[in-house]
A protein has these predicted regions:
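Short loop/turn segments that connect beta-strands within beta-propeller blades
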Residues: 69-73, 116-120, 164-168, 211-215, ...
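Gly/Pro-rich loop segments of beta-rich domains
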Residues: 20-45, 73-92, 121-139, 169-187, ...
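Short loop/turn segments immediately following the C-termini of beta-strands
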Residues: 60, 107, 155, 202, ...
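Residue-level detector of Asp-centered blade-edge/turn motifs that repeat once per structural unit
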Residues: 49-52, 96-99, 143-147, 191-194, ...
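Blade-level signature of beta-propeller repeat domains, shared across WD40, Kelch, NHL, RCC1
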Residues: 279-306
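A short loop-to-beta-strand structural motif that recurs across blades of beta-propeller domains
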Residues: 63-66, 110-114, 158-161, 205-209, ...
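Conserved beta-propeller blade signature
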Residues: 54-56, 101-103, 149-151, 196-198, ...
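Beta-strand-rich domains and repeat architectures in extracellular enzymes and scaffolds
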Residues: 36-53, 57-60
């Protein structure tokens, strides 16, 4: 997807030092600054690469999506502030299905919007409330492209909801608490090749894993800053080998785990240099293993190879 050889020629020794020479990751590129113009951000909480094509970033407080080439060249803006079809009130998370259609958690409009890969509005579903198919604080979203399911997390309803890709409500699970299958301040969600669902249980500093029907499988993580510990896990991304990547927000780093929760590696620390982060929230991994990180506090996207 990325021309990593060409891009990596510009990598500075400082960037490699920030990542760590033994981490197995290399800084590739970055883009974005704070602002309202094209290619600028105000609260980018997620990022998703669409294979061999482009990258979509929800620009939260600018109430829009931005579309870039895979090396960060600005292409287009999708949406404006509002409540109508194709408009947003704090779009938080984004994912795509196997056809390249884009799904957006339109948080303060309490709905999910679906667009074509070109940004044309297709449909919307959801409303404000606590019932089936309703949202109070819609947050993360993930599409299972093999089985055509959409999963969404709700921070204040403490649940995960499952839909078909046309917006039909299928089921939900979860409640407030610390027990298995309970949550405290839900963040992102993603799905592996087997249809298992991984959720960032931010307030409990852990990751929980379920099957596609909501049955609890396992959990990992405790509060702290050591390997495998978290201080606010937010973003979740599963790669083609079912490894799980987590943005550890207040530890300003990315951690990588096996599908059973075994710690593999970590990279990043607090700062503004290449390879450093300030409260990174969202991330995704493309088919070649390149990691795209929404470096939220630095108002930029960073890309790494491994």
């Amino acid at each position: 997807m990325l021309n990593l050889v060409a891009l990596s020629l510009g990598i500075e020794d400082e960037a490699l030092a920030q990542i760590g020479s033994s981490s197995g990751y290399e800084y590739v590129t970055k883009w974005g600054t704070q602002g309202e113009g094209p290619g600028q951000f105000d609260g980018q909480n997620d990022v998703v690469p669409i294979e061999e094509s482009f990258v979509i970033v929800p620009d939260y407080d600018n109430h829009r999506l931005q579309k870039f080439s895979d090396n960060g060249t600005f292409i287009a803006t999708i949406g404006t502030s509002g409540e109508l079809e194709g408009e947003f009130d704090n779009p938080h998370s984004v994912d795509v299905d196997s056809d390249g259609n884009i799904y957006v958690s339109d948080k303060d409009n309490h709905r999910i919007q679906k667009f074509s890969s070109e940004g044309d509005f297709i449909t919307a579903f959801g409303s404000e409330g606590t019932g089936d198919g309703q949202f109070t604080h819609l947050h993360g979203i993930a599409v299972d492209p093999v089985r055509d399911f959409v999963y969404a997390t709700d921070t204040e309803n403490y649940d995960i909801q499952k839909f078909s890709t046309d917006g039909t409500f299928l089921k939900s699970w979860g409640s407030e608490g610390e027990a298995d299958g309970q949550f405290s301040s839900l963040e992102s969600v993603d799905v592996d090749s087997q249809g298992n669902v991984y959720v960032a249980d931010y307030g409990n500093d852990r990751i929980q894993k379920f099957d596609g029907e909501g049955n609890f499988i396992l959990k990992w993580g405790t509060p702290g800053s050591a390997d495998g510990q978290f201080d606010g896990p937010a973003g979740v991304a599963v790669d083609s080998n079912d490894n799980v990547y987590i943005t550890d927000v207040n530890n300003h780093r990315i951690q990588k785990f096996s599908s059973t929760g075994s710690f593999i590696s970590a990279f990043g620390n607090e700062g503004e240099a290449d390879g450093q982060f300030v409260q990174p929230e969202g991330l995704d991994v493309d088919s070649e293993g390149n990691i795209y990180v929404a470096d939220t506090g630095n108002f930029r996207i960073q890309v790494f190879s491994q």
